[in-house]
Structure formats: C-alpha cells, structure tokens
C-alpha cells in the first residue's frame, strides 16, 4: 500500500509540470525574447496562452521579433486585439487568401513601422478603410484607393510645422499635419488594416544631397512604390522622387535606400530624427531603384517660389531664353520639401525664370549638373 501511495503521489506531482509544459507551445526564439521582457513577461505569456491556435504563428512572430522596449511594455490585450484584427481583415478582402505568409507576418501583422508611439490603430483604420477598398480586387488597387481618399477624410497634409517626424497616426490626425514619414506611417497602417502588405522605405540623404525622404511600398505579386498622400492617377511605381532614387548608392550608408522590416535582419533602418537608434531592422533595396546613369546633355534647374516669410507658394512659373515655351507650377507648402518644379535646359545658356511677376536671370552650368533657383514673391 505504501508503495502505491508513493507512486500515486509522484504521478500527481508530475501532472502539473506536464500540463504546464504542454501549454508552453512556443519555440526557442520566443523563449529567448521572454527573457528580455522583465516585469512584463507575464503579459506576453498571457497573450501566448490566450491566442487561438490558428493565430499562434503570428503571435510567436511578433514576440520573437519585438524590440526590447516593446517586450517590456506592450500588454496582452493590445497584442491579442492586433493579431485578431489582422486575421479578420484577411478574411474580408478578395486578395487576403493570396497574400504569402511571409508578407502577411512581416508587412500586415506588425503594429508599428519604425519607432513611432505604439497605439492600436488597426480597429479604427479597419472600419474606415474597408468600405473604401471593398470592391477592389487586388492589394495594389486597394493601396491606390486608400492613398487617393484617406488623407482627405482624415484632413492630414504634409507640413514642416508638424511636431515630430515620426508621429503615430493619432498624433498626425490630431494636428492635421505630418512629415513624409508621418504620412507614410498613416498609409502603411491603413493598408495593413485591410490586409495590404505595406512597409516604409526611405533614404537618409539623396545622392544629390537635397535631403532625406520616406515613402511606401505595397505588395502585389512583388513590391511597388508610391508616395504617401501623393497618389499618381497612372498607378503605382510613379512619383516625383524617381529621378532622385535612380541615383541612390547601394554601398553608401547615407545614400542607399532601405525598406523597414519587423523581422530581425543584419542591418538597421536609418532614423534621421534619431540616428543613434538602431533598433528598427531593414533591408537594403537600392538595387530596385538605382539605374545606370545615362550621360545627360542638359542642365537641370529646380525652382522654388516663396513669400516674404519663406513659405512655399504654388504659382505659375515660366522660363524664357534660347528654349522658349517652358512653364509649370511651383510647389506649395503641402508638397514635400524636396519636391521642386524641374526644367531641363541647354547648358551654358542664359535664361529668365519668371514667377509672380518677379524675373530672375540665370546662366545654366555644365551638362549633368543642377541648381536650385529660389524666387521670392512680394506680398500683394
């Protein structure tokens, strides 16, 4: 009898351990991430335990690839809601079943793009965006519709007066203003909310040294780019920055083009507002943008028109000289700072650039070079 009691006690003691072991279904990368969670470990384990079995791969992906700061702060309710809504969207759209698992996990599921404030934007964007894309047949078509409609609805536009470069959607909506990065975050999140794989892409500095830029790539049987809040009626893979991107240099850290990734990689996405922060993984995608430089036979003139307070103005601009009949409209404050009206002119010739009744005489330089011409228009 004593032996039986001893064996029974041993079996009973073993049962909780066995059950506990079975409940911990996750793999080594998740276990390693949990070790970095500190006091928040219980919240992550709660999310892992509660997630439906058909969503386990997604929750494991998130936890295994989270930045340390998120491991130590994000709560189970946040993670469970984010994951559930991502799967819900996948079932609601025509293209959901065709999205490769790799793109779903890395470019639909994640709750953040770079280092913006973490917030549960997915529910609001799902409700706003699903009616916009409901009749679309492809993720690319859906992205185009969102880019053409959402910013008007949200009343958010580009502005250098925004509070921060890396604003979350709610921060940009509250101000009605955002940087190219803030606009890209909104478009990426809106796309992800309706199962359009999307990611931020950018360069720390154009090769011509006219500044940095951020835009969006969406997946539709391959990656395609678009400028956030800059939809081109002709479709994806068009934008004012195409020429600048063609000059990118893959092996130059500051002049290369990077796509942000949630999944860990061996390089980081340069955050121009926080260059010491190397916590956002990235992929160098310069090869898809850079083109062999054809020998140029013209001199490029980029025109900026401003008022007395240096605010950019959208006004008619003409160029007269050897080559007549050139005209266009300068960019106003709602256009990206680096988006300038461009004229390709014969080299070493004299021209007159006119805007708002103000004339400026210029002499073009050598072929292949460029110059920014700024014209200040007096107040009316």
Regions found by a protein language model. Give the residues of each.
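Bacterial N-terminal signal peptides
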Residues: 4-14
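Secondary-structure boundary elements
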Residues: 42-46, 53-175, 211
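Hydrophobic/aromatic-rich core segments of domains that either
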Residues: 142-149, 159-171, 175-176, 181-270
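Beta-strand-rich domain onsets/edges
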Residues: 266-300
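Extracellular beta-sheet/turn segments enriched in Thr/Pro/Gly and aliphatic residues
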Residues: 282-295, 360-380
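A short, amphipathic beta-strand motif
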Residues: 299-309
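Short, ordered, surface-exposed loop/turn motifs in non-cytosolic proteins
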Residues: 308-329, 347-348
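Short Pro-Gly-centered beta-turn/loop motif in secreted/extracellular proteins
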Residues: 334-352, 356-357, 363-367
